[in-house]
């Protein structure tokens, strides 16, 4: 890891269907081995299932799901005098978004539905209703931060 320059942030283009940058980031996270067209069909397919099930705009369901999954606080290890403490710190907005996307996708991959499209749509619907493994992950992280609140004065 270079100490001189931090990597420049690349500009992410909005997706073709909804014109939303977050959907593009989500698509890029779903993508395996550079197969963007496959990732695109998975995400848009999941959005189609959501629209047919809920009769709502899938973008609002997606944004609600992401909001319910994004953490506001997390713990980071800090070594003080030979002891390692789990120090609760606030999460930056870019990291919040990245973690939320990552947790949604990993929770969807762990589900039992037949295709990834079905898994993703089911996880997004669950997350938008404050259920599912992605929301559970966020609550676990928040619980961990709450349990280690005594060490918050070690923040840096």
Swiss-Prot record:
Transmembrane segments: none annotated. One of its GO terms (cellular component) is small ribosomal subunit. Keywords: Ribonucleoprotein, Ribosomal protein, RNA-binding, rRNA-binding, tRNA-binding. InterPro entries: Ribosomal_uS7 (IPR000235), Ribosomal_uS7_bac/org-type (IPR005717), Ribosomal_uS7_CS (IPR020606), Ribosomal_uS7_dom (IPR023798), Ribosomal_uS7_dom_sf (IPR036823). One of the primary rRNA binding proteins, it binds directly to 16S rRNA where it nucleates assembly of the head domain of the 30S subunit. Is located at the subunit interface close to the decoding center, probably blocks exit of the E-site tRNA. Part of the 30S ribosomal subunit. Contacts proteins S9 and S11. This is Small ribosomal subunit protein uS7. The gene is rpsG.
């Amino acid at each position: 890891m270079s100490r001189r320059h931090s990597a420049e942030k690349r500009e992410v283009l909005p997706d073709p269907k909804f014109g939303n940058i977050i959907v593009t980031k989500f698509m890029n996270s779903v993508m395996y081995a550079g197969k963007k067209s496959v990732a695109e069909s998975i995400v848009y397919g999941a959005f189609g299932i959501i629209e047919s099930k809920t009769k709502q705009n899938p973008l609002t369901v997606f944004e609600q799901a992401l909001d319910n999954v994004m953490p506001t606080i997390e713990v980071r290890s800090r070594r003080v005098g030979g002891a390692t403490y789990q120090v609760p710190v606030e999460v930056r907005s870019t990291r919040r978004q990245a973690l939320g996307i990552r947790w949604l996708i990993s929770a969807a991959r762990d589900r039992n539905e037949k295709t990834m499209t079905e898994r993703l749509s089911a996880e997004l619907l669950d997350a938008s209703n404050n259920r599912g493994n992605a929301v559970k992950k966020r609550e676990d992280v928040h619980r961990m931060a709450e349990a280690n609140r005594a060490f918050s004065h070690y923040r840096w």
